[in-house]
Curated annotation (Swiss-Prot):
Alphabetical list of SUPFAM superfamilies matching this protein: Cysteine alpha-hairpin motif
Intervals of motif Cx9C motif 2: 34-44
Domain commentary: The twin Cx9C motifs are involved in the recognition by the mitochondrial disulfide relay system.
PROSITE patterns: CHCH
Organism lineage: Eukaryota, Fungi, Dikarya, Ascomycota, Saccharomycotina
Protein's name in the database: Cx9C motif-containing protein 4, mitochondrial
One GO CC annotation: mitochondrial intermembrane space
Amino acid sequence: MAEEEIDYNSQPCHAYACRIQDCLQRSGYNESKCTKLIDELYECCAKFYMSKGEDARSTSCPKPNLLKLKIQQRESKDVDAVLLEFAKK
């Protein structure tokens, strides 16, 4: 049985996810340089779930419960710096 091919370009919020990947590659995977783009993706995903329901899925969005956690974490002003310092050790 063949797996169904996913058209990623038609996935909700896919363009935001691609912008993050481009930013991470350009910045040497320094997440703090891409903060605005990450926030934009999460905002897009939140709108997606609000309009389609929490059972909806997009390959570009975390599942609703993880998205809520990620948004809460990003509200912490030190989240990027902490992650970068941890990664350096």
